[in-house]
Amino acid sequence: MRIMENPFISLLEKVSQTTQKLTQGVSVLNNLDAIEIGTTEKEQVWSCDKVKLYRYQRTTEPLVKTPVVVSYALINRFHMMDLQPDRSLMRKLLDLGLDIYVIDTGYPTRNERYLTMNDYINYYLDEAIDFVRESHGIDKVNLMGICQGGTFSVIYSAIHPEKSKTLLPCHSG
């Protein structure tokens, strides 16, 4: 004899599970300040409007002469590449001997509603790359773009091949 499952009890169990997950989620959100991300030391070296350029701090001399400029998405935060000391792309790249810069466009607000891709690519990205080139006395940088920053990097490298030595677009689809 087969026992039929009571759909009402099944629904109540699912509602209870969802309520528990929501309660846990609210608890996590209430304690976000206690979570420390982006722990790899960096220094702001350039800014224009609300766009900032950070240089990650090295404890040794870089093994690679040409620095890497990382362009990230406008919506997500570049901190996603530096979650914890043992889960940090930035820390790993530094450990591999690279000199790393990252561009922070800040959170878009209504004030930026008239900015175009041209502004972000041919003004902010170009100015940040020129700063790095001049600081190091070099003609070209290595350019790494992640998410929307990958798209920006591909476009930038096509427009300014004289400034981009190596292009690494990541998840730029």
Model-identified regions with their sequence ranges:
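Short helix-loop-beta connector
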Residues: 137-140
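Alpha/beta-hydrolase active-site loop
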Residues: 115-135
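Active-site signature of alpha/beta-hydrolase-fold catalytic machinery across serine-
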Residues: 155-160
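Short, surface-exposed "cap/lid" segments of acyl-processing enzymes
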Residues: 38-109
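N-terminal targeting or regulatory segments adjacent to alpha/beta-hydrolase or S9 domains
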Residues: 1-38
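A conserved short beta-strand
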Residues: 162-173
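Gly/Ala-rich beta-loop-alpha elbow adjacent to hydrolase catalytic centers
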Residues: 144-149, 153
